[in-house]
Amino acid sequence: MNDSKKTVHATVLGYPRIGADRELKRAVEAHWAGRRDEAGLEAAAAAIRSEMLDDLAAAGLDSVPTGVFSLYDHVLDTAVAVDAIAPRHRRENESATYFAAARGDATAAPLEMTKWFDTNYHYLVPEIGPDTEFRARPGKALAEFGEARARRLNARPVLLGPVSFLLLAKAADDAPEGFAPLDRIEELTAVYAELLSALVEAGAEWVQIDEPALCADRTEAEREAV
């Protein structure tokens, strides 16, 4: 008989990001209306993330997820992390670029929105073409990982996986006929390797890579891309 003790570890896959009293919604809307500047928006976001970490720490989890907060949409956050931003949305700073993609402005239409796997949540659809220049931009992932580490929490960065990201995307308007975003999987996985390297260098011992698209019916070619 094996008398060795088995340890059960507890964690959660993610955490609600809107705030206990919908603080994020009010802060973002105030920013759009010009009543809260960029620094004020980030202060509100930081307070929500702090409350989230308080709750996760109090739950006694063995590992807490980081990178699950978003000002608007986690798929858009992933597009920013790999620099897959449509040229029409690029602005003078990251915040302006982010919200141009999310909401559009006087000069550019926003990204399309569609249902997240037939749920009531809608995500922003990235636009990918043969000439999309992917680059690793790990700033958000590193910052939120660092916030948890500063509290001495066993933090686990969470990323939307490259296969799901491309399957959730659509071909850019100027892409040639027959092009599919998944055609860029090799280039994108190289950028993900850079993101992972940055997280490991910052102290991450493991990273949660979500591939929800694999829960749906897929073609053989799509499955092979994994």
Task: Indicate residue ranges for each PLM-predicted region.
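Domain-level signal for soluble alpha/beta catalytic cores
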Residues: M1-V226
